[in-house]
Amino acid sequence: MSIVQTPAKRMTGGELGLILVFAALGFFSIVVAAKAYTPEYAFHAYLFAAASIATVFVIGNRYMDRPAELPPQTIDGKPNYNMAPVKVGTLLAVFWGIAGFLIGVIIALQMAYPLFNFDLPWISFGRLRPLHTSAVIFAFGGNVLIATSFYVVQRTSHARLAGYLAPWFVVLGYNFFIVIAGTGYLLGITQGKEYAEPEWYADLWLTIVWVTYFLVFLGTVLKRKEPHIYVANWFYLAFILTIAVLHLGNNAAIPVSVFSPKSYIVWSGVQDAMVQWWYGHNAVGFFLTAGFLALMYYFIPKRADKPVYSYRLSIVHFWALIFLYIWAGPHHLHYTALPDWAQTLGMTFSIMLWMPSWGGMINGLMTLSGAWDKLRTDPIIRMMVVAVAFYGMATFEGPMMSVKSVNSLSHYTEWGIGHVHSGALGWVAYISFGAIYCLIPWLWNKREMYSMKAIEWHFWVSTLGIVLYICAMWVAGILQGLMWRAYTALGFLEYSFIETVEAMHPLYVIRAIGGILFLAGSLIMAWNVFMTITRAETVSQPSGAALAPAE
């Protein structure tokens, strides 16, 4: 009689290392909380301590429950994909999306009806506005990018995600950063830098998470079984790497003390403004553009069951975008103390960006060649194609607004808000919704979303909301700009500032209505996601196959 010996279970170096690191972090956080200069900072230190202690217990419990052998890279010769972090990231994206849209509706109502501030500092416009932008960009958008990148890189590489605990650290660590940043805004902890409000300790935590994200993604690409690196992975890598550089450069700061939330940025004056908008514009360029173009290059061909229209054009699109986008930041600082040559440089590169941007748009739209009927029959395809159309519109409007003569009218007005939201709602949100509608059935092995009719409703309700929103802001912005520059025959300003504010009121109300409709659409999506996971018909095999590279 033969005896089969099972290998002895041993804790991996990663498990042991993380337990020790988080135990030390928990102890250090308790010390910081006890000596913190402010109660708000002490609250954050206690959050770090609680999260660290919980992580130690979770890793220990996971070790006790797992078999001696770590999950294999392949099963019966097929890749053993690690989709659990992708599932969590996708659901968190839905949650944060609704939260961010809800906060946006609240601050839109505050703009139209200031009584909605309720004289409470924690929910005043000044604190909710950065909470809204961070929730929709970094919480919703960031989770979409992390989840889809982990899915796409595995499928196109035919390889399991690199690392055992590292993918979980990326997903959960990133969302812990969102919690720290968001609660910090409500408590008044901020650097005062747009899109980079979190203070030094949150930035430091995000740096650790982001480096891990880069290593997991790159490690998966390096161990790929496919000789070809699919173009979507190029865009993901550019987004991850460039955001890391931008984050480090713009958040270079010296803390007052380890016991204080306050820090001082190493840049000052006009140099600080330039670095801020080098970061701010390229957060748009690489977080909200390059990252989501990766979604376009994977999910539209997958859903349409067609290859990318021109793979060569996608490579040209990639390199042109990467080279040009990084120079366009100064167009945010027209008519300021920034040297005129730098303003002109930013304007020039912004105009040049129009061509590669539209090259990508054409590539995305023409991928549907031979499958245009799906625009009528498939609301998910329709949503993603409309997203690409909004991308084209926003990338024409942006270069146009960067021209100094146009910018003299549009700068500091609601036109800029309309432009941002045509890209954020029309491009980023719609391509994200399309990706989520694709991912949910694939991840949970469902035949299709629970209700295609609900997706139709989501599309039309949200589209009406977007149209109301951006049209109201376009009209408001142009009206604002014209009223500000209107003079009487004697050379006096024709309108007082309060008159320009009063003229905005009906347009602010329309914006709030548009936001409510967009939020309603996202709630329909959340219901559909829940019903798909719990009620929809299950299939025996996962329906999302790897995407073969197009030629």
From Swiss-Prot:
SUPFAM superfamilies: Cytochrome c oxidase subunit I-like. GO terms for biological process: electron transport coupled proton transport; oxidative phosphorylation; respiratory electron transport chain. InterPro entries: Cyt_c_oxase-like_su1_dom, Cyt_c_oxase-like_su1_sf, Cyt_C_Oxase_1, Cyt_c_Oxase_su1_BS, Cyt_c_oxidase_cbb3_su1. Cu cation binds at residues 281, 331-332. Heme b 2; high-spin binds at residue 419. Its EC number is 7.1.1.9. Gene3D superfamilies: Cytochrome c oxidase-like, subunit I domain. Pfam families: COX1. Binds 1 copper ion per subunit, denoted as copper B. Its cofactor is Cu(2+); heme b. Keywords: Cell membrane, Copper, Electron transport, Heme, Iron, Membrane, Metal-binding, Respiratory chain, Translocase, Transmembrane, Transmembrane helix, Transport. Heme b 1; low-spin binds at residues 132, 421. It is found in: Cell membrane. GO terms for cellular component: plasma membrane. It is a multi-pass membrane protein. It is an enzyme of class 7 (translocase). The chain crosses the membrane at residues 14-34, 40-60, 88-108, 133-153, 169-189, 202-222, 229-249, 280-300, 313-333, 345-365, 383-403, 424-444, 459-479, 513-533. Coiled coil: none annotated. It catalyses: 4 Fe(II)-[cytochrome c] + O2 + 8 H(+)(in) = 4 Fe(III)-[cytochrome c] + 2 H2O + 4 H(+)(out). Pathway: Energy metabolism; oxidative phosphorylation. GO terms for molecular function: cytochrome-c oxidase activity; heme binding; metal ion binding. Belongs to the heme-copper respiratory oxidase family. Cytochrome c oxidase is the component of the respiratory chain that catalyzes the reduction of oxygen to water. Subunits 1-3 form the functional core of the enzyme complex. Co I is the catalytic subunit of the enzyme. Electrons originating in cytochrome c or a quinol are transferred to the bimetallic center formed by a high-spin heme and copper B. This is Cytochrome c oxidase subunit 1 homolog. The gene is fixN.
